[in-house]
Amino acid sequence: YNPLRRPELVTERRNVVFQQMYRNDMITKDERDSLSLLPLNIDYSPESHREGLATYFRAYLQEFMNKWLRDNPKPDGSRYNLYSDGLRIYTTIDSRLQSLAEESMNEHLKNLQSEFFSQNKESEENPTPPFKDLREGQVDTLIKLSAMRSERWRKMKLNGKNEDEIWATFQVDTPMKVFSWSGEIDTIMKPIDSIRYYKFHLRASMMSMEPQTGHVKVWVGGYNYKHFQYDQVKQGRRQIGSTFKPFLYATAIDQLKLSPCYTVPDALYCIEPMKHGNMNAWCPKNSSDRYGQTRNLKNALANSINTISARLMDQVGPKPVVTLMKKMGINSYLPEVPSIALGTPDISLYEMVGAYSTFVNKGIYIEPIFITRIEDKNGVPLFEVIPETTDVLSEEAAYVTVNLMEGVTKYGSGGRLRHSGLEETNYIYKNLITGYPYAFENAIAGKTGTTQNQSDGWFMGMVPNLVTGVWVGGEDRAVHFDDIAFGQGATMALPIWGQFMKKAYLNPELGISKEDFPVPEIVSIPLDCENLNIESSEKKKDLEELGF
């Protein structure tokens, strides 16, 4: 008795009820007759993707399904109706984890945005907020380009308005509702001013995946689909900063059998001109601009030491690193030049989570899966997903890379995940590290990432059965914090991961692992750096031959 598919049957059934009411003296004959003549007047529209849980995922799912419906007609050749044909679509999203992820993102972004507003007031030193290092003319151009991509502009263009007419409407005070973290605001504002207002707002995305199955458990493309419809999980591509480095280290481990314990001098290092596709010499500096220590590879990755990344890139070359990343599902453009070691390529969060899952899944890449099957109304399967896998790394090389990344959360840039609260007097810890202290004691591998000028903050966090990536940044690269203490991945993105995992561990039914990462049966590469004297071993000679 679906009123959308069988209105005549439903009308007949309704009139039977009216007849029974008349027979039982509940209504008069005239009332029965008049009610029976009324149409159903079904007030129905499909649920909006603008509100509720997993709005960005539902919008992406609808896009996927629309394409699937075009390519997969009914047996009679007609097209399935997504809303009225009773299709059963089974997705991999865990609503409980999804809810925790959205809560965690909202809690942290609210704190972070408040700080960003306070640091971006217009002044003589900051004449074009929220844009850093842009002149007024450049800002005007950027704003106009954004206006031309807006829904308002598109609709007026379709209605035959010319550019001057459309642009004039952007200068007129207009009633509108705008987003704020304290709730939607009814206001009057010029559309051109609303664009700049929204540019002030930092954006974010988050995705979680079960590495052994490829099942996507969390998909958060942003924090308010009504006002920010661009999905930063799959559509957005941003520079990934130091989250690139595990791919470089994994290539070196796989090709050269390097141990996390190998010691390397932290000194300025140059790749000479005309080598590895370079036209000029490439001599990256450390973000701290400090040098002089001797570090093992585990410490170097934990602290994102650029000079040691340059040494590794010189030894393996960019091409093998790019080849590895493409096998791990990264289809974004990757130039084969040494500077990619610092994370200059633009890559989506979707690609990054899939790629990082390879490390936890014994070196096997599984393409992320968000639908397992589609059935018709009778339960007949119409579509079932067969996971696509690729052998990328040996199980040993994958495990050693995970072991390296465990150092990031033990004594590196992700170490605040281990803190128990001793830093509470610090302004940033007290006000911006949402959910702090986390005091995690279980095995966690991860990597922070921060791009040039703090335009992007990343954190990739892994436990044995869940890989999660978080990105935070402005819509435009010119929108960023000035101070790296505020704009680094450990401040912008890591707290979302920490808060999310903290909440997830409170519910044992979710089954999120607190165990150690499984160790392969054979591990020939030394991992116990405290009890291994590399300097007195034959490995020192091997390293010298490799240029270390």
Residue ranges: model-predicted function:
Residues 1-8, 17-18, 22, 42-52, ...:
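Second-shell loop/turn segments in exported
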Residues 1-155, 312, 326-327, 331-333, ...:
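Non-catalytic, structured segments within soluble enzyme domains
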Residues 9-20, 34, 52, 56, ...:
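Extracytoplasmic/secreted proteins, especially bacterial periplasmic and envelope-associated proteins
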Residues 17-28, 65, 69, 108-116, ...:
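A generic secondary-structure signal for well-formed alpha-helical elements
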Residues 45-57, 258-319, 365, 375-406:
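Conserved catalytic neighborhood of penicillin-recognizing serine enzymes
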Residues 91, 95-111, 141-210, 215, ...:
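A penicillin-recognizing enzyme superfamily signal
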Residues 231, 235-276, 411, 502:
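Active-site rim segments in enzyme catalytic domains, especially the processed small/beta chain
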Residues 278-285, 316-354, 363:
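Mid-domain, small-residue-enriched loop/turn segments at the edges of structured enzyme/sensor domains
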